């Protein structure tokens, strides 16, 4: 699951993923993070 700090970051992440890039690369580019669980930390719920 990916967790992003803002809607803008989420949009960047989603657009990056559409290009076929990996989750880790897109998370790094957008400022989002990949977690192993199912619930994002407070403030990372985008």
Swiss-Prot record:
Subcellular location: Secreted
Keyword Flavoprotein belongs to the record: no
Cystine pairings recorded for this chain: 3-40, 4-32, 16-26
Primary localization class, coarse: secreted
One cellular component term from this protein's GO annotations in UniProt: extracellular region
GO BP of this protein: defense response
GO molecular function, one term: toxin activity
Pfam families membership: Thionin
Function: Thionins are small plant proteins which are toxic to animal cells. They seem to exert their toxic effect at the level of the cell membrane. Their precise function is not known.
The family this protein is said to belong to: Belongs to the plant thionin (TC 1.C.44) family.
Name under which the protein is recorded: Ligatoxin-B
Species annotation: Phoradendron liga
